[in-house]
């Protein structure tokens, strides 16, 4: 049922994973179990082999070759990448180590912090509340939390769930992210929401948020009576079969197969500590996951599991809401035309393709994922190092699709 093709090189193995059409009726958990049973044979880690060769299908050979070579040049400690379609995992590979100066290899089950890619789960959670008539996109935040003040009182009374999820609250961008950097947790920062400067009317301009965006967690808890982490686990992770995915620092620290964050110190990657404050804004930055589970997540957003996320549901979540200005790294990609934020996702036009995307970065970790619904193809990358190389991964992948 599953075919594997291995490299003939003795120093390193690559594998292309293929599922036959007869597996289409299986639930994602059963597919994942099958992958787990075969992962030792299917997904061995790369060695430090500068003469990397791939037996991938030609569509991805050049991209994967570039990625491995660039990662070697940057001496990235550990990484994982997957290329998927709606129907299958086309390619999945890990390489390197979970922590510098150890022999602990990154495996397909190794868990990374995915940082701001967590926002895609928050947008989906908000959409589930709306789909179940527990909330509406146009509900005012002050109707849910009467004492809440976000910025000035006039604008605060107009901010909706849609504005929160689409980063269009009109509040100063990155409000209080500096406090997260300093280790101040969400519960304390919320007390200062009324002090946030308002820069435009809600819905009129883009302003990326971590702290304010995390009000989605409060809304989930108020609407369902469940903690945000439990809701995501029960309504997203478990139904999709994402068995290594968790929310929060405690869950991360309970696992043994986790990756360690790394930062550059005088040109060398050194292990560092996790910043617990960013876990306190769980909707913005609190998800942990392996490459196996992130491959499932991209497939789900390509429409692999319509009984969980229907085409209409995905269309809503991936719909552009507010245009994003130039200035961020993704806006400087050469072939990018227009860029928007949707409901927890970025959407942009790239060389004639509509791409759905999000990246992530938190102390010692970088991540990127992007997919093209029209071409039924997507990619996700996880680094246990805060490397700027991640900035180039999505355009390299997309440029390769057009060759």
Can you describe what each PLM-predicted range is?
Residues 2-9, 14, 18-109, 128-136, ...:
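N-terminal leader/targeting segments and the immediately adjacent pre-domain N-terminus
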Residues 120-125, 214-215, 291-296:
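Short amphipathic alpha-helical face segments that pack within enzyme cores
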Residues 50-56, 111-113, 149-152, 176-180, ...:
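Second-shell loop/turn segments in exported
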Residues 46-93, 221-234, 238, 272-403:
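Catalytic loop of the DD-peptidase/beta-lactamase superfamily, centered on the K-T-G motif
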């Amino acid at each position: 049922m599953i075919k594997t093709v291995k490299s003939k090189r003795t120093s390193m193995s690559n594998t292309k994973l293929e599922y036959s059409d007869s597996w289409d009726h299986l639930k994602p958990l059963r597919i994942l179990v099958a992958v787990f049973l075969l992962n030792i044979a299917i997904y061995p880690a790369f060695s430090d082999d500068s003469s990397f060769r791939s037996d991938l299908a030609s569509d991805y050979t050049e991209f994967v070759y570039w990625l491995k070579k660039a990662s070697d040049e940057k001496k990235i400690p550990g990484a994982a990448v997957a290329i998927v379609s709606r129907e299958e995992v086309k390619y999945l590979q890990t390489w390197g180590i979970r922590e510098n100066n150890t022999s602990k290899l990154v495996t397909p089950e190794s868990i990374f912090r995915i940082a701001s890619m967590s926002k895609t789960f928050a947008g989906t959670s908000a959409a589930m509340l709306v789909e179940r008539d527990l909330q509406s996109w146009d509900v005012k935040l002050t109707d849910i939390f009467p004492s809440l003040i976000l910025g000035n009182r006039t604008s605060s009374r107009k901010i909706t769930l849609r504005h929160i999820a689409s980063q269009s609250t009109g509040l100063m961008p990155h409000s209080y992210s500096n406090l997260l950097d300093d280790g101040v947790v969400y519960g304390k920062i919320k007390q200062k929401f009324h002090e946030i400067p308002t820069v435009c009317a809600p819905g009129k301009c883009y302003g990326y948020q971590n702290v304010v965006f995390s009000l989605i967690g409060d809304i989930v808890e108020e609407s369902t009576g469940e903690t945000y982490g439990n809701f995501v686990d029960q309504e997203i992770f478990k139904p999709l079969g994402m068995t290594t995915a968790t929310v929060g620092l405690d869950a991360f620290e309970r696992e043994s197969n986790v990756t360690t964050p790394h930062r550059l110190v005088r040109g060398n990657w050194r292990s560092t500590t996790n910043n617990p404050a960013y876990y306190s804004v769980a909707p913005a930055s609190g998800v942990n996951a392996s490459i196996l589970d992130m491959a499932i997540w991209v497939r789900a957003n390509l429409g692999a599991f319509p009984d969980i996320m229907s085409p209409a549901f995905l269309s809503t979540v991936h719909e552009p809401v507010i245009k994003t200005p130039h200035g961020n790294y993704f806006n400087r990609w050469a072939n990018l035309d227009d860029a928007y934020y949707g409901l927890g996702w970025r959407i942009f036009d790239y060389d004639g393709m509509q791409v759905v995307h999000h990246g992530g970065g938190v102390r010692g970790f970088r991540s990127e994922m992007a997919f093209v619904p029209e071409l039924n193809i997507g990619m996700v990358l996880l680094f246990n190092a805060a490397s700027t190389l991640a900035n180039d991964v999505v355009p390299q992948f997309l440029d390769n699709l057009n060759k």
